[in-house]
Amino acid sequence: MSRQAIDFKPLPYPQTPKSAQKYFVRHGINRSAWARYFGFERTVVEHLLRGQLKGRRGMAHEAAIKLGLKEKPED
């Protein structure tokens, strides 16, 4: 059995924390592996999905964008 490289993608915007959780389950995606792939701490992703973080700045903000919880800002 060979291991294939997984190419994770950001979740489509807009998502709620509940819909993002369901997305991971529906697509069989491991949240820890997804967080590692994008360089996020697992706890940041988990707290965003539980609604404990809002993703206002820093790593939480970037993770919220990748999770589809926030729209990507126009620069």
Which positions does each model-derived feature cover?
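Recognition helix of helix-turn-helix/homeodomain-like DNA-binding domains
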Residues: 40-54
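A short, Lys/Arg-rich alpha-helix, primarily the initiator
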Residues: 2-26, 70-74
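Short alpha-helical "recognition helix" segments of helix-turn-helix
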Residues: 34-35
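Alpha-helical structural elements of signaling/regulatory helical domains
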Residues: 29, 54-55
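DNA major-groove recognition helix of helix-turn-helix/homeodomain DNA-binding modules
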Residues: 57-74
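Generic structural marker for isolated residues within well-ordered, non-membrane alpha-helices
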Residues: 20, 31, 60
